[in-house]
């Protein structure tokens, strides 16, 4: 006669088995009280969101240009860059609406430095509370200069700490298909661009636009740090960002294909073109070539191109982050960027394209 095996007794615990440490995270409200938005920053953000809304809906024929470093790792260099970009933005204000790219979070294919919020000291100390404070202070300083800021929303909690200072947001190629990021975009107070998939697929971005325009209910954290259920009304100010895939998609054929896919889904064909990433075949200097092609399309009268994105820093190229070695000033530590001189020339090229588009429209 067989004896029935008794179940093994439960020993120990079943949760947090791979968590090595838990540290307190500052509540968003405490940081917002320590670094409150002032009237100057508020005016910059409000005006910029309204301007982007008008551009996306055809009421403003300027070209939105999101320009700046691949990622922020040095507040001082970022402010120096912002001062230069503010001057260029003022010079081209009639043709371009310039937003500074201020990216604090970096999606990684495997592992690596995850950005200024996650590791502000660049040493693996993960001083996230300090990173949040430094990020918010930098955004305040740039907005006070009258220059609006754009960022990528990657972590689902970080918007509670900085989103009131963001004029335009992006959802990256790796997260465009993520349901949680689509839900987040549906509740953000700023316009949002969704990149096409890493393989070049436009469909995932089109689906993201439709999802983000709809109401959602999801779990999140309030400004006071409490778990809560958020209900959104949907975001009408979302658009596609063409960043290339297996092949570039910045050219006229790529724009046409994306516009057709948007039209087939009943969506307006409003497109931003990322000059970097797969559109530049990961060669940062090709952004100049890509920009020239896009400027020609704009100059020929294409009104579907409403924005561009440029990875640019004080100095060109990139550098490795090596422990114990000083970093060169104003050089990216993530993707390589154009230097300032090439950036200034590229902005002039784009502004000229917008002026030509106006002439074409009046003929």
Predicted regions and their residues:
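Internal helix-turn-beta structural module
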Residues: 313-359
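A contiguous, surface-oriented mixed alpha/beta subdomain in the mid-to-C-terminal portion of proteins
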Residues: 239-245, 249, 257-272
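Acidic (Asp/Glu)-rich catalytic clusters
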Residues: 56-59, 86-93, 137-146, 231-232, ...
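Conserved, mostly hydrophobic/aromatic
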Residues: 68, 273, 339
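Active-site-facing alpha/beta catalytic cores
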Residues: 2, 9-15, 82, 95-250, ...
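Conserved phosphate/anionic-ligand binding catalytic regions in large, soluble enzymes, centered on
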Residues: 64-77, 335
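N- or domain-start disorder-to-order transition segments that initiate the globular core
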Residues: 15-59
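Gly-rich Lys/Arg/Thr-decorated short loops/hinges at beta-loop-alpha junctions or inter-strand turns
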Residues: 27-36, 232-244, 327
């Amino acid at each position: 006669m067989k004896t029935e095996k008794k179940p093994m007794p439960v020993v120990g615990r079943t949760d947090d088995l791979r968590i090595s440490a838990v540290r307190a995270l500052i509540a968003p409200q405490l940081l917002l009280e320590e670094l409150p938005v002032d009237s100057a920053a508020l005016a910059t953000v409000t005006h910029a969101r309204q301007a982007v809304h008008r551009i996306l809906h055809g009421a403003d024929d300027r070209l939105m240009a999101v320009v700046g470093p691949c990622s922020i790792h040095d507040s001082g260099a970022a402010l120096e860059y912002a001062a230069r970009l503010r001057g260029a933005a003022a010079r081209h204000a009639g043709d371009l609406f310039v937003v500074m790219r201020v990216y604090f979070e970096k999606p990684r294919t495997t592992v690596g430095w995850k950005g200024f919020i996650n590791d502000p000291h660049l040493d693996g100390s993960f001083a996230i509370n300090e990173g949040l404070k430094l990020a918010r202070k930098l955004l305040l300083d740039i907005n006070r200069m009258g220059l609006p800021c754009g960022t990528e929303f990657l972590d689902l909690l970080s918007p509670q700490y900085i989103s009131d200072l963001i004029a335009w947001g992006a959802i990256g190629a790796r997260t465009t298909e993520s349901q949680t990021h689509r839900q987040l975009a549906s509740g953000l107070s700023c316009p949002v661009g969704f990149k096409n998939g890493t393989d070049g697929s436009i469909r995932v971005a089109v689906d993201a636009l439709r999802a983000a325009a709809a109401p959602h209910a999801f779990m999140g954290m309030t400004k006071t740090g409490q778990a809560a259920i958020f209900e959104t009304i949907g975001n009408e100010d979302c658009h596609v960002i063409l960043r290339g895939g297996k092949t570039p998609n910045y050219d006229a054929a790529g724009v046409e294909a994306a516009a057709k896919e948007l039209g087939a889904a009943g969506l307006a064909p409003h497109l931003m073109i990322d000059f970097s990433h797969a559109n530049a075949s990961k060669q940062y200097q090709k952004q100049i070539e890509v920009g020239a092609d896009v400027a020609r399309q704009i100059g020929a009268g294409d009104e579907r191109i409403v924005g561009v994105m440029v990875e640019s820093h004080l100095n060109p190229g990139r550098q490795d982050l090596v422990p114990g070695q000083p970093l060169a000033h104003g050089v990216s530590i993530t993707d390589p960027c154009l230097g300032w001189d090439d950036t200034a020339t590229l902005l002039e090229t784009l502004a000229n394209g917008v002026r030509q588009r106006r002439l074409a429209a009046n003929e």
